[in-house]
């Protein structure tokens, strides 16, 4: 969601802050701003919309100063406009904030009674006034910030700057991530390491309840009680990646085309392609001894987990409980310390997923984090990190992270099957061999781009689309619908094909394209029956299948996308690509902001 950057430097910082904020655009935002200290006074520039608007403003009205804070805002309290954009000021205090102050209404009423006037609708301005009130009592800036922090409830990350002090930024974290970057005679704050990549790869991650006093040549970190604490300084892996589109129009397009490579990297971490066996993993539990596996995630990661459920139950006979993270911890389901739980998140910072992780931690369960950022909060709070080696994913709509999550889960399901005695050594080799073929098949699918683009052009003319699938293709149908609606804004729904007659069939007519995901498998004929029901009502069928399915289907289709004949275990990985490409090209034809669709954020760090 919101992105935070702070720099205590030795040259003009405003352009550097904007550059760092660009690296946080993937998180989603609707306004942006920068504040510096010019000649001892606070100065700021803010703009609604994209960073290019802020850049224009800074070109017209440059900001001097060697210290500054910047922010990209994703609206929670108050509409997206310049007035609500950060940084917010109050009597010599400048602040940027990510998260939600849950007791903001109570604090606002208290501050109004004390004579403080509010110029915005945000909860952030409450914090600025709280700090200013403590300064007015005679406290020094650091202590004023500390006292204000003790009044806050909720999930937040903050960066605070003070008029007249060009060698101080106070940062604080309680939920959303915040990192300190160590430079040579300069220091940095950022929502993640990617923002700080141009400046440093030496990072200290704040933990929940931490607040930091950041100066040019030092950082001191304290807990909420003011006790000094030590946090590990580490080299960030994220800084090794350049964030650019290459020769592609959008990050999403680039990331779709990176999938053969990153799937290969991810699989190679978990299986040995040469010997045909799963690689040993230092897991905190034994697959053979647990009675159940819990999985929780949000959005696309949840759908990856749902496919993982099929795999674990099929290949390892391991029962899986799965739910979206926002519901998981409210179900009051029985949890056992003898079982394990996997939590899936690209960023490793998803608030609901992190809350579910902590819920299972309290129950004594062993925790695995399937994440794309090894330094993330979820990774640090888990017993084992199960990395997806996708590299930074900038497009808000997940593509390569999704297929890498599937690659991890498929590999783990094979390992679990071996450990539980369900899979023989020969079967393991067959499955690992199948997994090793996934990158090659993914490359073949990408060569269908011209056909898929043509189909997407036709698809973009409709207002509603239905996706159908059975077995692992049911979650894929939901993923296809999610992709289409989140970036093209075309209404779409994904259903289990067998549920068609239980409601969705009422919507079928000549204005309803139906995308059917149906490789030629043991239930192919059942899906064909559902296609016949659609055809009988005038629905326009787009079939995604393989050569066997295309040869045997008896129903007339509007279009048929023929994929390679692939082994069952990698089918969801390979069939994910055409649904991503359909959504991408449909969005291009609709003229939407593909990489940063409206109202969405890449990293959802509030519940």
From Swiss-Prot:
The active site is at residues 2, 602. This is Glutamine--fructose-6-phosphate aminotransferase [isomerizing]. GO terms for biological process: carbohydrate metabolic process; fructose 6-phosphate metabolic process; protein N-linked glycosylation; UDP-N-acetylglucosamine metabolic process. Keywords: Aminotransferase, Cytoplasm, Glutamine amidotransferase, Repeat, Transferase. GO terms for cellular component: cytosol. It is found in: Cytoplasm. PANTHER family: GLUCOSAMINE--FRUCTOSE-6-PHOSPHATE AMINOTRANSFERASE, ISOMERIZING, GLUTAMINE--FRUCTOSE-6-PHOSPHATE TRANSAMINASE (ISOMERIZING). Pfam families: GATase_6, SIS. It comes from Mesorhizobium japonicum (strain LMG 29417 / CECT 9101 / MAFF 303099).
